[in-house]
Amino acid sequence: MVFAEMEYPQHYSEFHAELLAFVHRHFSRVESGLQGDSYVWILDGEDKVAIDTFTSMKHLIKSPTAGAHVQKVIETLLQRFKLHVYQTPEREAHEDA
């Protein structure tokens, strides 16, 4: 499910390093990559929040389930970045209705 979309003026590939540096300062288990698309995964036990451009030209904040793990990531990102937080999470095309 998609919970929010980040807003920034530059191409996502130019924004990746800034986003990654910020996330690393606030979360201990982070995986990332930039090759064609940008992704940052924040891992906490069994929970994972993805911030990626796999289906968008801007970074989307995603997780299979809603919960405190998603809220924590959104609240942390809002400290520095502009986000459009969806009132109701949106399903991705590959997710069952």
Regions found by a protein language model. Give the residues of each.
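Terminal, regulation- and interaction-focused segments at domain boundaries
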Residues: M1-E14
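Short, intrinsically disordered low-complexity segments
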Residues: S13-A68
